[in-house]
Design a protein with these regions (language model features):
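Conserved beta-strand hairpin/beta-sheet module of binuclear metal-dependent hydrolase folds
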Residues: 1-35, 39
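Active-site metal-binding motif and surrounding structural segment of the metallo-beta-lactamase
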Residues: 26-73
């Protein structure tokens, strides 16, 4: 398992064959453009954990990724 801190609250967790991105917020940019994600997890709605502009773009670039979000984030990703 490899855990990479991408800035502020954002981390990329990689295991054998799985890539999970956690809290892609607007205080970090290293996650923008990531592809081949298996899942995206957002813990809550604050912009430093869920970038309202770039998160939808990330999900478009990873159409097969499972998305797990706290209920207040649904409007951002829907």
């Amino acid at each position: 398992m490899q855990i990479t801190h991408l800035g502020h609250s954002c981390v990329l967790i990689e295991t054998a064959g799985q890539r999970v991105l956690v809290d892609p917020g607007d205080f970090s940019t290293a996650w923008r453009g990531l592809t081949d994600l298996d899942a995206v997890l957002v813990t809550h709605q604050h912009p430093d954990h869920a970038d309202p502009v770039w998160l939808p773009r990330l999900l478009d670039a990873n159409p097969n990724a499972m998305v797990a979000v706290e209920s207040s984030v649904v409007d951002i990703v829907d």
